[in-house]
Design a protein with these regions (language model features):
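Catalytic center-proximal scaffold of phosphoryl-transfer enzymes
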Residues: 1-109
Length: 109
């Protein structure tokens, strides 16, 4: 398809998925426990970061330019009140220690 057609498809898909994405984001941010991780992603030669926040029933994804605390907050919200299970990357250090669990697989490495 032509570039304009591809752009239109992307815009239509984004519009169609806006409400379901918002529902998943709300559910994930309200969860009592989250598993969060990020991984590098090459996008047209530029480094990006794919973030994921998972619960037993839903996973929220966000692709961004940064791998820092602010990027994490954009995913889970600034005031996430539940238990966060993560690796030991410093972006997660701002979460209260009494509500943070380090992933067992990362502890074993």
């Amino acid at each position: 398809p032509a570039l304009g057609t591809t752009q239109r498809f992307a815009e239509e898909a984004g519009a169609a998925l806006a409400a379901p994405y918002a529902e998943v984001r709300t559910a994930v941010r309200a969860s009592a426990r989250l598993w969060v991780d990020e991984t590098s992603w090459a996008l047209r030669g530029a480094l990006r970061w794919l973030w994921a926040a998972a619960t037993p029933t839903a996973t929220l994804y966000r692709l961004g330019r940064r791998r820092n605390r602010r990027a994490c907050e954009l995913l889970i919200g600034r005031a996430y009140a539940g238990v966060l299970t993560t690796d030991r990357w410093r972006a997660y250090d701002g979460h209260p220690l009494d509500r943070r669990q380090v992933c067992w697989a990362h502890l074993l490495r």
